[in-house]
Amino acid sequence: MKIKKIKNFSTINQAERFAKKNIRKGTFDWLQAGAENGFTRNKNIKDLENLKILPKVLKGIKDTKISTNIFGFKISSPLILAPMGHQTQFHSRGEVETAMAFNDQSRLAFFSTQGRMSLRDIRRKNKNAIIGWEIFPFGDKKWIEKEIKDAEKFKCFSICFCLDANVRSHRY
């Protein structure tokens, strides 16, 4: 899949229009659909539509440092990248490329067994990234133990389990 060079976007809508033009329809629909029946996605959209920033609340703030400490790391902002599976649908090196944005050790990122790039590949190209590893327990006990050992071997700061998806979704 050949995608035009990605531009800087000012809005989510601009990024969405770009993606819709440049990604295969089935892949774009999958990206937009949300898990299972889309309940969480739709609720999140509704909640975000009700969120308002009141400028007077931020009036007079001169120091906008938002860095914080979490899990023993000083990070540049309290935002953490949640794991997203199947990124290779959108870029041939998927999670490896995403992790590059976290290689400066100022932000936390989670990746998961639902990705198509191995933890080994992600870490090989991103030695300094602060990475957490999420395990979907679809495999047997031996496989899960291997994933835990790999997370330790590749110096993940955290290991977590996705326990609400112990069976594969009916949508895929």
Question: How does the language model describe each region?
Answer:
Residues G94-G132:
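A glycine-rich phosphate/pyrophosphate-binding beta-strand-loop-alpha-helix module
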Residues L79-A82, R107-F111, I131-I135, I159:
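Hydrophobic faces of well-ordered beta-strands that scaffold small-molecule active sites
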Residues G115-M117, I135-G139, A165:
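Short, acidic/turn-prone active-site loops that include or flank metal/cofactor-
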Residues K2-G72, R171:
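An N-cap/entry alpha-helix motif that binds or orients negatively charged groups
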Residues R24, L81, F102, F161:
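Conserved, mostly hydrophobic/aromatic
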Residues E36-F39, Q89-G94:
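A structural motif shared across PLP-dependent enzymes of the aminotransferase-like
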Residues I80-S92, W133-K142:
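Active-site mouth loops of central-metabolism enzymes
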Residues H86, M100, K125, K141-Y172:
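Alpha/beta enzyme core
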